[in-house]
Amino acid sequence: MNQLTNLSSAEISAQHEQDAKDLTRILPASKKVYIEGSRPDIQVPMREISLTDTPTGLGGEHNPPIMVYDTSGVYTDPNVQIDLNKGLPSVRQKWIEERNDTDVLSGLTSKFGQERLKDIRTADIRFAHIQNPRRAKAGKNVTQMHYAKQGIITPEMEYIAIRENQRQHEAVDMRQHPGQNFGAKNLKEITPEFVRQEVAEGRAIIPANINHPELEPMIIGRNFLVKINANIGNSALGSSIDEEVAKMTWATRWGADTIMDLSTGKNIHETREWIIRNSPVPIGTVPIYQALEKVDGVAENLTWEIFKDTLIEQAEQGVDYFTIHAGVLLRYVPLTANRLTGIVSRGGSIMAQWCLAHHEENFLYTHFDEICEIMKAYDVSFSLGDGLRPGCIQDANDEAQFSELKTLGELTHRAWERDVQVMIEGPGHVPMHMIKENMDLQLEVCKEAPFYTLGPLTTDIAPGYDHITSAIGAAMIGWYGTAMLCYVTPKEHLGLPNKKDVKDGIITYKIAAHAADLAKGHPGAQARDNALSKARFEFRWDDQFNLSLDPDTARSMHDETLPKEAHKSAHFCSMCGPKFCSMKITQNVRDYANNLTNSDSEVEEGLKAMKEVYQEQGQKLYHKV
């Protein structure tokens, strides 16, 4: 891939080679498997983790493989040749064509998209295989919500049902705590009909633009597995197209369910094209960021026409959901005046500045119905932005935040009237005891539309560790009902994250999401925990590593003190050593108890024999000698 960078050609080539190895290396003891649906082209990917047998001394039983949800796409399929210059193979193209409700356009229709194609300065960095976009035929609505309301189960819905189940019905150890789901539904099996019903009622969304056929369908809703989003994107201070594509593929490898491209630097249009064409997961954006770049960063120069063209430009590229800050109303802006940190949302501050400069209502609000018409022509989902979210715990749950949330509830109904899919963005910075109020109010005013939250961060004193401060809040709000958690990296508030930061943020949020699934009692959520705990008790070290969210780190930490291969079968670790391992002691206690059981039976027989002698001797305790 040719592109703008300060590295030499040799350095770029070496970096590409290393990235390719990192991205395509399958995790240890794992293999990509596909579950076929009702038709041959529904092939749902999962990762199967093989386990070793229990040692003979501990019972010698066979441990079946564990199936886990997989977001890595074909990058971890050894049978697929990866070529970033061509993009990923299409998953949904045939399904889209079969519905016969879209037209292939003769070319891009957005003014800016056409300009970029003609600009010779972008030729070297442009994706080489740009396809003509699709759009709904006149009078047609192509959203998954529209199909669901018509009673149609699409291939995407069947795909999702298979994916959500993770074949947990085959798991051997399904013991699980019941959990507290706060009114969510815990079905033992997700069916295509249930997926359809949840989408029709607005309780879940399937972000799947008709111009992103490469994506593997997924669902966001509180009655499904809690999902996580990873943010990437360049800035005016750095990063390149190569780096952003690498971050995207790296993020999906470790479990990102969706990606948001928040680029604000150079070549936003081209960067986004590369990302979408190579992404197996839905891509979200904040269109106002690019619109602002088109007016050289001067918020008051923004117009509806510029924003509308930006929406069409991004929809034709294949963006699956838009964050749109239509709830930042003119009358709400003064409510932020006494805040400790004011308006911290970039999108929110842009629209607040525009409203004050013109003393007019937010044009995203006044043109909302027109935005809906664009969204339904491409099946782009709304992610209604929380532009007035609290930027510190002092500002949590204030009048500005909740006023905007109520407006987002109103906008949700307006979108649903046009069968446009909606999720709602949430805070932010909220101390633990104030988190549930956010979830309860959102469920009430937005009628159970999926909630998508950034954390929330539960304290403000830990720069450099905000992936942890936010994961605490994320686990809690995920338990209460949030459908998707936006990850936070260690670099939050400090700088642009690199690959390591992205991975750290994702693993942290995978923990939070899984903890929420366990707390809700989501069926099958505990199967992997049970398998890992069993491996730990049986000192199957490799199985412990392989079942973990980050096998590489688990193995590396173990090997820092016990690096030899023989240590992988040792019945202790460096924490306690061979004499004080609690699990080894427990096994000894079990062995002792088993031996006691045998001894007890022998004693029992002896007592029985003495009883017979006693009866034969007339049941007398004493006898004359």
UniProtKB/Swiss-Prot annotation:
Record key words, sorted: 4Fe-4S, Iron, Iron-sulfur, Lyase, Metal-binding, S-adenosyl-L-methionine, Thiamine biosynthesis, Zinc
Cofactors: [4Fe-4S] cluster
UniProt keyword Iron present: yes
EC number: 4.1.99.17
Positions with a binding annotation for substrate: N231, M260, Y289, H325, S345, R346, G347, D386, G387, L388, R389, E425, Y452
An example Gene Ontology CC term for this record: cytosol
Catalytic activities: 5-amino-1-(5-phospho-beta-D-ribosyl)imidazole + S-adenosyl-L-methionine = 4-amino-2-methyl-5-(phosphooxymethyl)pyrimidine + CO + 5'-deoxyadenosine + formate + L-methionine + 3 H(+)
One Pfam family hit: ThiC-associated
List of residues binding Zn(2+): H429, H493
Residues annotated as binding [4Fe-4S] cluster: C573, C576, C581
Pathway assigned to this chain's UniProt record: Cofactor biosynthesis; thiamine diphosphate biosynthesis
Gene3D superfamilies listed in its UniProt record: 6.10.250.620, Radical SAM ThiC family, central domain (3.20.20.540)
Molecular function terms, GO-annotated: 4 iron, 4 sulfur cluster binding; carbon-carbon lyase activity; zinc ion binding
Self-association and partners: Homodimer.
Protein name: Phosphomethylpyrimidine synthase
Protein species of origin: Acinetobacter baumannii (strain SDF)
